[in-house]
Every structure is written in structure tokens, then in C-alpha cells.
Amino acid sequence: MLNAQINFTAKDQVPDYNGKFRFGVNPGYHGSDWGDEDLADIAAGEAGVGAFRASLPEFFLEQWGYDVEIDDFQHYQSVGMEDHVAFIGYPTDEHQEETFYCPNHQSELFSNMYLDIWDGGANGTPVNDENHYALYVYRMVTTYQDYVRFWEVWNEPDFDYSGNGYKDAGQPGNWFDNVPEPCDMSIRAPIFAYIRMLRISYEVIKSIDPDAYVAIGGLGFPSFLDLVMRHSDNPDEGQITDVYPDNGGAYFDVMSYHAYPHIDGSLREWNNDIGDFDYFRHSDAATDGILQKQIDFRTVLYNYGYNDQLYPAKKWIITEANIPGIAFDDEMGSEEAQRNFLIKTRVGCELNNILQLDLFQLARKKLPEDANSGFDAMGLFHRLSDIEPSGEELTSQGIASQTMTALLSDATYDAAATTALNLPANIGGAAYENSDGTYTFILWAKTTTDQSESVAGNYSMPASMNMTDLEKREWNFSQTGNFNIVFANEISLTGAPVFLRGIPVAVDISEQPLLSHTLDIFPNPSPDNFQLSIKGTTTANFQIEVINVFGVLIEQRKIVHNGSRVIHNFDCSSWAKGAYFVKVRSAEGLVVLKVVVD
């Protein structure tokens, strides 16, 4: 069956995301003893990973067959991994553009991309089979649409050989005010050709799976994003014409970026007084660096109207990020900082609507004594290539990941409860509601000292949350099984995040029966509305209050009951998911009923 061409762009719509936050990882290659299924087994089963950032290059699929990875993706699904990212592109030699846009460097992109994308089914597919990239995307997405949620177009197309990508507007050679030469970028082709890839990707992918997400590929520089946003795919300087009607922002749903705070300038600032840098090499500054990059990219997107006002806002994923477990030169790096960074960054992602964080990487490439850069000291596992499956060993970051996933596996980030924590400036954290109605709080004292994770802080749960005792678990709980009880008004914190679990006692559940009346709530649980039934033969005045688990009043009513059975409807479609208490009071007493909104 031929797919219909689409009649919309990302200027018109971006699909809602109804999945949960996923902690993913870049799996990498670790020798012939480790197949993709083996890596998935240890990633999901031991490190708590929920998704892979996979790669499906054309040269690989053409050589081995387009369905070569189906068994692997089915296995990922069987171990609980879903909503994967796949970065795409990378043509076969036969399909690589032959143009040399600069001496000694052939274009890395596909040939024939400027042929028509569609041919009305002339060759049995809806796309023009002579447009090599369009045909590759069509065949790939048709095969893997049930497994891949985010299609990331290329990997780091903005990788910069010129030294200009990082520059701010106004500086010589910057990309905000200038168009880079093709060979300044890793694609070795004009920026307009990359936008052409985005357009082909968007049109073809959306024709097959309108709810799939097209992501701009793992960017590091806001200036490259600005290039895409201000040009079309027109090879004539990116001008807008009838044939090339939109700039690049129309052809992707998701802003995907990469961030490595230890090398991107996040952790230092020039000080004229000392003629040197001030450094901030600690985990909170590293997490702040990750989130500052989101702000920088968002500023560009908003400048071009992608702000949910003129056009739909983009969704967000991070497909590479980490800091080293070993310090090199003046860079940040320690085991303690690395594991703290992971937990803090996961929390930061959820606080800022980032849908997925794909850590770099599953396992370290070298032993500590052989490492010669920070990237050699990143991973949830120690080096795998020297050992066979079953001999793997988690790093401390991997243990923290295992603990984090175990304690949050059935939990959902709760923005309202996080706000209710009223955290002071020196305390970081968030609230998560567990499926049983209890809460897990991740809290820590914010680090402030260069090259130190040592800090102390105290926090007391607000009285309105009605917490008494909490179970406190540390980053290595998945290995030790240890926890202790702390008072909710005397919580001592350090720079290492802790997991605190407790149930708020928002109301006195003791019921004083209303002897003349029978009360019932249905349906319960309820997705969008529930009904309160009051049955009795006598006249009575009722005061009804609905409160959440923190005692916050959600709705109140006064009802005069004149006998018989009366049904009162409550619209809960706008309420946050979770448990609520319906307090029904009359002259005879109080009844408290629990209802769950799901």
C-alpha cells in the first residue's frame, strides 16, 4: 500500500509525547564476544537502562539487509527497553555524493537528494527510488517504525573543523552572522544540503508514521541551529521560493543535543583580575551546564517563533552527555562527581521537560591505567572488550544508575509536589509519585566548591506535606540493600543525592459514619470524571471538600440533600494523576473517601 504525501510540517503540529522519561545509553561496540542482545541484557538488567541510542546507517543496512536488526530490537523490547533513538544517514560508496566542495574532501552526504522526493508509485514505492536518501529512509522506517521513536538525522552534523562554531554573534567568522564553508563541518557539504536531509526525512517518515519524531541530529552549537532555522533547503543560498517554501525549522519535531561540560566551557569563566580562569568543577555546575545548553538552543528556537505561540515548540532529548570518572589536565573528573552528576542530571531533565537522556556510554573503552582522555573514563560498566558476558562489572556510576532506576521504576515525576517542597536555593531535588500513592523524593545539598563534592545542608519537609518519618536510601542501595529512617523535619544532606520514601498523611482517615446516609464513589479509579452517590431518606446539608495527598484543596461544594439517591459529578480530567480524598461532612459527622485519578 502506497503512503500518501503529507500536507503539514512542524510549523503546524508536533505530536504529543505520552511515554515516560527514559534513561538511555549509547551502547557502542565492545568486541565480537558482545552482541547487541548481550549488551541489552546487561544494560537493562544490571544498569537500569530503558532505551538505546542505536545507529541504522544505509551502508550497513544495504550490506546486511534492511531487517538485520529486527531480532535485536525485539529483544530490546523483551527486556523492557522501548522508545529508542536511531541516528541515521551515512550512505554506501555507490550512493555517496561525488562532489568535492573543497580540496581533498568528498561530500559525506547522499547523491541525488535534489531529485524529486515522490514519484507517485512509479517504481512500486511512493518515493522516487532514484533519490537514494528518500528510498533508504522509506525502507528503514517501514521496517523499524514499531521500535524507534526518535529518528535523529545524522550524528553531530555541526562537528566543527574551523573553530568558529562556538563563537557568539559579532565575533569574526561566527555562524550566526555567516554561512560556514562546506568543509568547516563534518558533513563536508553546504548547510542547505543538510536541511534537504531534514526535509526528506520529515516528509518520508511522517508519511509512514505521523506520530514518530524527527530530530535534528545531536547538535553541539546553537549557531548551527540558527543556520538551519534561517535557511531553506534551496541549494541557491537557502532562499525561500515556491519549490523551497520553508526554512529548516519546519522539518523537525525534536531538538536533540550533546553536552560534555568538562570540555565545553561550562565549568570555567575568565577572570581579568587574575588573568586566568575561575573553575567550577563539581557535579551541580556540570548539571547546570547541561541545562544551560538547553536554554541556549531554546533561545534560538524562540527567536524563530517555535514557542507554542507562532509555531509549536520542539520536544527535547539529549543523546550524548557525561563527565569523566578520571580527571585529565585541567578538566573535571572523579568517580564521586560522575555518579552524582548522573542522578542530578536525570532530575534536571525531568524538571525541564527533556524526554530522554542517552548517556555516553555503556562501558569504558580502556582500563583506568590506559586511559588518556576523559572519554576513556565514561561508562556504566568497566571495560568489556577483555572479558566475556557474565564477567562484567559496574562502575560506581553504573551502580548509581541501577539504584536510580530501581527506586523510580514505577514512579512519575510530580511537578506540583516538587513545587510544594519549597526547596531553598542550596538544596536540589524533585518529587516522584509511586504507583501505590507514596512518594520518593530525591534531594541533595548543592555543591559549590571547585573540584569538591563535599558540602553539607539541612532540609525540613514543609508542615503542609504532613510527613513524619522517611526511608533514606543512598546511591549504592541496589548493591547494599541498606536504608535508615530519618525525621522529615531533620534531613541532613550532602552533595550525593539520596532517595527518601514516605507517605504523606494528609487527612485523618478515621471515619465517623453518617448514620442516615450511604456514600459511594464510582468509577474508582477514574480517568476523567467520577461520581459521588449520596443515598438517604432524610434532608441534610453536606459540605464536600476534595484534597490531594498534601492536603491542598482542589474543589469544594455545599449540597442540600432532600432525600432519595442523588449523584454528584466531579470533572477530574485536569487533575494530576494520583490519589485524592473526598471529605463529606454533615451535622452527623465526617466520612473520608479515597479516589484515584489515573
PLM regions with names:
Residues 481-507, 578:
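C-terminal beta-strand-rich structural cap/linker in extracellular carbohydrate-active enzymes
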Residues 110-158, 163, 185-208, 224-254, ...:
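An active-site-proximal structural segment forming one wall of the substrate-binding cleft
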Residues 5-141, 145, 152-153, 158-187, ...:
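N-terminal substrate-binding region of glycoside hydrolase catalytic domains
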Residues 460-479:
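Solvent-exposed beta-hairpin/edge-strand motifs
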Residues 325-402, 416-422:
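Aromatic/acidic polysaccharide-binding cleft in carbohydrate-active enzymes
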Residues 420-466:
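Carbohydrate-binding surface patches
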Residues 191-339, 352:
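Noncatalytic carbohydrate-binding groove/subsite architecture in carbohydrate-active enzymes
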Residues 513-598:
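C-terminal outer-membrane/trafficking sorting elements
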